Amino acid sequence: MTTTTFPDSAPAPADDARVIALIGFAHGVSHFFHLLLPPLFPWLMAEFGLSFVEIGATMTVFFVVSAVGQAMAGFGVDRFGALRILLAGISCFVLAGLGLAMATSSSALYAVAALAGLGNTVFHPADFTVLNRHVSPPRLGHAFSVHGLSGNLGWAAAPLFLTGLATLVGWRVAAASTIFVAIPAMLLLWHNRALLDTGHHAHAAKQSGHGTFDFMRVGAVWLCFAFFFLITAAFGAIQNFATPILQNLYQLPLGLAATALSTYLLAGAGGILVGGFVAQKQANDRIIAVVLGIAALLALLLAANVVPGWAVLPLMAGIGFFSGIAGPSRDLLVRRAATARFGQAAYGRIYGFVYSGLDAGLAAAPLVFGGYMDRGEYAAVLI
């Protein structure tokens, strides 16, 4: 068993709170722009005559660009500092929103998806570099908890914002209005630049005696990447297909099946909050194994189709809650993998590479599990 513990006291709680809030808000903005396109799919399909496959491919473009770029963005964070890279990423979101508002062809939608994906590349390496450098170790568990929760809130806000405006004033105005989400984040980060700047660490990396790519020889880094890929592919399967799965397995009406998915996501947010307190005590790989094991058992029970329909919502809540608990401990264990041999000089590179597994998993999920859905093997997706 491996455990990470922290000292009981730390200075500057007010500064810690400011850093956590600023990075949390920026992360929420990044998740908001994950969903720049999907809430507008009905309008975009009608405008440009696209099929579900064609419009869905925009998200494949988004996550492929994000996965590849995230691994490279970590090098930029280590070289130029996290603040500059964060501002560059949010600038891409501004351009993506304006580009979508002015789109005149389906090819423009793919360009917008690529630009938004490029903006998304910076957040995990930059966010976690700032948090690890500027938040006191005793509060890192809570910092990672807020970071994860803010992402969920960004996901929740985007459909309400975009569909609401598109219904009232049209999809182009809705797309253009997203700049009023991104620009305040840029201004806040710039205003607090002295608090957030991580400096340049390329020279420190050279002085440490480690080569630029030496981290890729560490087995723990590859294990973290594989773990992120697998767990996010599973999340993507539920996020994309839970509603039709539950409709077919349990004959639930559409509204109730969609409510079950919302229940899963909200319970996941609650789990992240609880997970922050768990991780603050000790970031333990056994805890991660136990809570994910419980979530897997609940998913198997749901897939077995042996429970009554009323039990679907509690089971979905349980899957989301226990999966969420693992998040902050997972992030702290990645921190340990980053610092064990390379200290602070390689935060950006290691976080960028490991967390590119998230986007790779989200990109792969529709392709891998979509085949099961097409064949009517709904339970297999949950298994």
Listing of model-derived features with the role each one plays in the protein:
Residues 79-90, 280-292:
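Cytoplasmic membrane-interface "Motif A"-like loop-to-helix N-cap segments
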Residues 112-151:
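Cytoplasmic helix-loop-helix junction between adjacent transmembrane helices
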Residues 285-330:
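C-terminal transmembrane helical hairpin of 12-TM major facilitator-type secondary transporters
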